[in-house]
Design a protein with these regions (language model features):
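Catalytic-site neighborhoods of secreted/periplasmic enzymes
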Residues: 57-178
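Active-site-proximal N-terminal segment of extracellular/periplasmic enzymes that hydrolyze or transfer
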Residues: 1-44, 48-50
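A short beta-strand-to-alpha-helix junction
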Residues: 3, 26-29, 73-79, 258-270, ...
């Protein structure tokens, strides 16, 4: 009897490739992600086509592009998910998650799974602990007064109060945490391992683990255990775990931004630790030779200027630059040559076809993504010529081997610039200096990409037509061209 094939997808929300050793970070500690890359396949050019959280998961679960048709919406009756396709087959399906957006009322993203387990309390679900009084934590200890004044002057007092109220609700739970194992990612992966220990080995299984970490709040163990941050041990200021979403330099000093990034880095390392716990359990249970393991993320994280982004802190603008749209994905598959680094363009809608192909279900005819098994096995060199990304009704982008093109839709609140092209192979020093002055202020040297914008725009719109895209691309002809900052 053949050993049943199984699949595990582990989602780390808001995981930036810039904070992973195998993606080129030389100072962070991510030994288990690095181990997974050595044992599996690392995808260098994976882009989330529909941003952010919910559209990405819809694409991953259904294998269909979301950007041309819709944004933050519920699953429809016409959507066919991986769990739907497993139904009626001898495949046990389970969802273990702490991402509140996966269970929004009436959205239906948990449908089809045989077993569902949810951990309360993360950002957007913090109200679950509203009734618990704060005893020994004070929310003001985590917000710098000067930064709050700057943010309030720019965004309004009500916006600041809402963020602090959310943070206070989060602290209502965090005040009881005492060890790294109290963090959401630890509890979620421990529950997933519990499922693996109990599942019937004579049947196939599909397990989706959805960790909202390392999404903000960036509250790693050092912040609630009274310890120095291991990546910034000399810091004497406040641990601003819920950064104010704005143009970074308008609110924070560079020293503050550095510490915020180091809190995030510590949380990434904690996620890595629990990835290792999962990998060890898979090996201990003898599942390595029969189980596809995919570590995925929905998007990266804008965190300032230069190498960290285009001037933003968090997703406060719908700008699909590399630091947001590019996501780290590593897959380990039995029978596939380990240690590969694949440069071919891959997208969030490729998850469902890959999982279904591996499980033997076959790629559903409604799926627009591609199974990546032929790519991983070396049977093909690529599955597409370019990638797309963006926010439905706000912005979209196309990424080719040489150029990226970003297009903003008309929206007075979000569109300081409307168009930009980025050359993939050049990062001029003066461009980085311009970004340091202001997130979207760019020098005239960038104009060299102007002739590339129109054909890239045309290619994108033609592609949207093949995906039954809706009419949403009405723009003011305001142009700005820049060299791409990778």
């Amino acid at each position: 009897m053949d050993t049943p094939k199984n699949a595990i997808v582990l989602m780390f929300d808001t995981l930036s490739a810039k904070y992973i050793g195998c993606y080129g970070n030389g100072w962070i500690k991510t030994p288990n992600m690095d181990r997974l890359a050595r044992e599996g396949v690392l995808f260098e050019n994976w882009y989330t086509e529909g941003l952010p959280t919910v559209p990405c998961r819809r694409a991953m679960l259904t294998g269909r592009y979301t950007l041309p048709q819709s944004g933050w919406v519920a699953l429809s009756m016409d959507d066919t998910t991986i769990a739907d396709l497993c139904w009626g087959r001898p495949i046990d399906t389970a969802l273990v998650f702490d991402c509140p957006m996966f269970r929004l009322p009436k959205f239906g993203y948990t449908r089809g799974f045989d077993k569902v387990w949810f951990l309360h309390g993360h950002e957007a679900d913090e109200h679950f602990f509203d009734g618990d009084p704060l005893i020994h934590m004070d929310v003001d200890d985590y917000f710098d007064e000067t930064s709050c004044e700057k943010y309030s002057a720019r965004s309004g007092k009500e916006a600041l109060e809402a963020i602090k109220a959310m943070s206070a609700s989060l602290l209502s739970e965090v005040q009881y945490w005492k060890t790294p194992e109290d963090r959401y990612v630890a509890k979620t992966i421990k529950k997933a391992v519990e499922y693996l220990r109990q599942v019937d080995r004579n049947k196939q299984f599909f397990l989706w683990i959805d960790s909202f970490d390392p999404h903000e709040p960036w509250l790693p163990p050092s912040t609630y255990m009274g310890l120095p941050c291991p990546y910034d041990p000399d810091w004497k200021g406040k641990d601003e775990f819920m950064p104010l979403p704005d143009i970074a330099n308008e609110v924070y000093t560079e020293e503050q931004l550095h510490h915020i990034r180091m809190l995030y880095a510590e949380l990434v390392t904690l996620c890595d630790t629990w990835l290792g716990h999962l990998m060890d359990a898979i090996r201990e249970l003898g599942l390595e030779s029969s189980t596809l393991l995919m570590m995925v993320s929905d998007h990266g994280s804008p965190q300032g200027n230069g190498e960290w982004g285009h001037g933003l802190m968090r997703k406060c603008r719908p700008w699909p630059y590399e630091e947001l749209a590019r996501a780290p994905v590593i897959a380990r598959c039995p029978g596939v040559k380990p240690g590969q680094r694949i440069k071919a363009f891959t997208q969030s809608c490729d998850v469902a076809p890959t999982v279904c192909d591996w499980l033997g279900i076959g790629v559903h005819p409604d799926m627009q993504g591609k199974s990546l098994l032929p790519l991983m096995r070396g049977e093909v060199d690529k599955v597409r010529d370019f990638a797309i990304a963006g926010y439905y009704d706000y912005s979209w982008a196309i990424y080719t081997e040489d150029w990226s093109y970003i297009h903003w839709l008309t929206d007075a609140e979000t569109a300081e610039v409307m168009r930009a092209t980025f050359y993939s192979k050049s990062v001029p020093k003066e461009h980085l200096e311009a970004l340091g002055r202001k997130g979207f202020a760019l020098d005239q040297d960038a104009m060299k990409g102007a002739d590339k914008a129109e054909p890239l725009e045309g290619k994108t719109l033609t592609y949207f037509d093949t995906l039954d895209g809706k009419e949403q691309w009405t723009c003011t002809p305001c142009l700005l061209y820049t060299s791409r900052c990778v």
